[in-house]
Amino acid sequence: MRSTQKTLALWFFLIIMAVFLFQAYESKQQKAIADFNFSKFTEAVKAGEVATVTFRQDTSEVVGEMKPEFEKKYNGTHFSIVGNTQDEGYKFLQQHGITPNYERADNGGFFQSLLVNWLPLILIVAMFLFIMRQIQAGGGKAMSFGKSRARLLTEHKNRVTFKEVAGVDEAKEDLQEIVSFLKDPKKYTKLGGRIPKGVLLVGSPGTGKTLLARAVAGEAGVPFFTISGSDFVEMFVGVGASRVRDLFEQGKKNAPCLIFIDEIDAVGRHRGAGMGGGHDEREQTLNQLLVEMDGFESSEGVIMIAATNRPDVLDPALLRPGRFDRRVIVNKPDLKGREQILAVHMRKTPLGPDVDASKIARGTPGFSGADLENLVNEAALVAARSDKKYLEMEDFEKAKDKVTMGAERRSMVISDEDKKVTAYHEAGHTLVGKKLVGLDPIHKVTIIPRGMALGVTQTLPEKESVSLSKSKAENMIAFLFGGRAAEELIFKDITTGAGNDIERATEIARRMVCEWGMSKLGPLAYETRDNPVFMGMGYGNKSKEYSDAKAQEIDTEVEKIIKHGYDISIQILRDHQDALERLTQALLEYETIDGHEVDMLVNGAAVAEIEKYRNAKKDSNAAIMNAAEKKGSGDPVGNTGPVTI
């Protein structure tokens, strides 16, 4: 602290001195008359413009001062010339009313000249040398651009353990092995094994890569440095490489240790792919990183962990064994993983007895860990707005709808005719989805506008699916055309409401023909995806490797698949038009119906039965809540322990 204060005081003194001397020098230069010679002096004396004159003995120098009213004329007040100091000069001045003064030459002139003319230059040189010394001195000093910005995490600061990481069991196992090696290296080295130099975490955004790295830091018990890939590159040339060197120097001093680089694609992109050739700053930084990880001087005991969601743009030299020996794929969680993640986040929230984590997990396919955390938080906000003591299943449903489909737009003005068209459209989707085999069950249908949609038919998968059969793909196309088919069947006209449905159906049909081999053209891939790296970015371009004649055949097959799906939708709606009417009337009356209510209507129940069912369900839920609260002595339900699955 004292050295810092001394440095600041020295800087302050030097700056004040430099400003003062510069102003004094400028002030003197501005008052001195430029280009003033002896002839101009005599003319000024004759004109009565000179106030004082001084002859300096032992020299031929004459100095003086003009009258103030003539300062603007001469752009100054003081003058200095080489003139005649004999009697003639004295008499000349006397004749014009000026009595000259005499003084000996100032012996301190040299020092004054040195102070005014040379001291500013000396100060500038001294400041430059001081700055260069500060740069070489290292961390904490001024202008230390080349020092690493890595942060050292302590054991007790934001400590995360593997117990708080769920849904990525395989990734946890790989990283737990790294932690085990750091704690007991002899267990592996006695069999000839060596510690991996680097671990690359690859996965979509929000899957928990950074959380895994924090868990490693919490479990390992060794120094853990963390830095972002963007922290290396600055506007100054050579800063990135210098920071890499400094980072590994810190790591070697604290070995064994872990270094975590988040978003490494910011510095590790493919060389030669962008503008600037092989000499741009990012490539110099990458070259230094490659050398530090596995060059002539090995970094024993320093384990690198990096995270990225763009492995396709990373330089191959960075991915080879010896640098990143292990690549850990962090996928989006499956059904079981989503249940585990929900359980972790639900521990912090009071839950009602009707909350079913497995049902929520089934209704959130494709959600990442971050999405699920946001879902639980959104449900808590929904419950808080209703002044509830605990979260109910209804709150999670509202939160999921808001996250997946957008907020309700109840203020949107919709005419009765448009509302009726939307109701028939969604009822058409629903009825086709119920009658076709193999599709996911209908979970909810609504005609309340959400996001960009006027209505939504939501399905809920019963199980995780890793592949798609031909029959299910064809049924999905028919399901997508259910809304358009209902419009044509009822109104004898069609609207733009099916635009997104048609786009999705066409994509499925084209992929069936060109990628999946599900047509008469056979199991051939007519379109391959290219991923060239251009300017550090991969573009998923499709290359067409077929003739124009084959393109015509492909279009024909796609049209057949689309027509077949549309015909199926029309036929189902014609055969069950009474059920279509019941679904439509229920949507117009209640705006939203759930999966059980859909089953009732499709199986022949009247619309009036929906109200009876809802009242019975409401009474049942109230009884369950009252019983649970009495059992828990009024405490929030679900707040007494961890969520069980």
Swiss-Prot record:
Gene3D superfamilies: 1.10.8.60, P-loop containing nucleotide triphosphate hydrolases, Peptidase M41. It is a multi-pass membrane protein. This is ATP-dependent zinc metalloprotease FtsH 1. SUPFAM superfamilies: FtsH protease domain-like, P-loop containing nucleoside triphosphate hydrolases. It comes from Bdellovibrio bacteriovorus (strain ATCC 15356 / DSM 50701 / NCIMB 9529 / HD100). Residues 1-6, 132-645 are cytoplasmic. The active site is at residue 426. It holds the Pfam family Peptidase_M41. GO terms for cellular component: plasma membrane. Its EC number is 3.4.24.-. ATP binds at residues 203-210. Its cofactor is Zn(2+). It comes from the Bacteria. In the central section; belongs to the AAA ATPase family. Coiled coil: none annotated. Keywords: ATP-binding, Cell inner membrane, Cell membrane, Hydrolase, Membrane, Metal-binding, Metalloprotease, Nucleotide-binding, Protease, Transmembrane, Transmembrane helix, Zinc. Acts as a processive, ATP-dependent zinc metallopeptidase for both cytoplasmic and membrane proteins. Plays a role in the quality control of integral membrane proteins. CDD domains: RecA-like_FtsH. One of its GO terms (molecular function) is ATP binding. One of its GO terms (biological process) is protein catabolic process. Zn(2+) binds at residues 425, 429, 501. Binds 1 zinc ion per subunit. The chain crosses the membrane at residues 7-27, 111-131.
